[in-house]
Each structure stands twice: as structure tokens, then as C-alpha cells.
Amino acid sequence: MTLRKLGWLLLGALLVAGAGEAQERKVPYWASINTGDALMRTGPERTYPATWRYRRRDLPIQVLQVYGNWRRIREQDGTEGWMLATLLSAQRTAVVTGNGPAPMYADPSSSASLNWRAEPGVVGRISNCESGWCLFDVGGKRGFVEVNRIWGVDAGEVVE
């Protein structure tokens, strides 16, 4: 077998393994929209009408159901519908909620120095979530935000 054929076989095996892993995730789970143009539909096929067009990359969503290559999702305001799995990413993101800016601290403590403030509606990537805090990154501006000020992570959830 040539090296080229072996490479194609390995690539195919990785793609199949990755697809199976995505199917096995336990719902509900968090994900994000990975494109600046995504349609939410009323059902799990392209023949169903689109109800919403999303033009905001990294918007957090919650996956409620898996049906083939389709995911039934819920967004922050409670709207539910179907979206192609290829439009979604495992990248964890969150959106600031509540009244007024959310403080972003240097450490996961309200007594730590204040790095930034993020207005409600600001979307950022999250990591290092534990004990009620998440590291929130908005275009390189980072700080720890209390979990109760963001939508995109469950209370008590640990995110690496």
C-alpha cells in the first residue's frame, strides 16, 4: 500500500470516528454558532421553512435533540428550532445577561482587581469555569465573570 493511500485511509477513519463522537454527546449540551450566516428551521430538513437567520458568529446555543445531521436548539430568549450540525461548533461561548455591565475580574473573586466590564448582550468565549466563575474572553480582553451574569453555562458546570 502506498503512503498516499494510507494517508487517505487514516483521514477517513478520523472523520468517521469524529462523527460518531458528536452523535454520542448527551443532550442537552452547549454549543455555539460557527458561522456568520446560519438558518434556524421549523424541522430537521432543508425543506422546512427558515424561521430565523443568525448573523452573529459564536452565539451560544443549547442543543436539545439530535436527529441525523440536524440539531434542535434553543437560544437565549427561549426560541427553539432546527439547525444543521455543520453550522455549530463545540467552542464554548456565553452572552452577558442582566442589568448593567458585568464585571470581569483578574481572578475568580469579586475582591480581585477589575479588568473590564462587559455590557449585556456581549458574546465571548468561556473556559476555566468552576465554583460559580468563568474566564470570559471578548476579543482578547479577558476576565472572570460570575456564572449568574452569563447565559451559556449551567450553574455548577465545570468547563476546562
Feature locations, PLM:
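Classic N-terminal secretory signal peptides
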Residues: 9-14
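SH3-family beta-barrel domains
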Residues: 22-42, 53-57, 64-79, 83-108, ...
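N-terminal signal peptide c-region/cleavage motif recognized by signal peptidases
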Residues: 17-19
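Bacterial N-terminal signal peptides that target proteins for export
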Residues: 1-8
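Second-shell loop/turn segments in exported
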Residues: 45-48
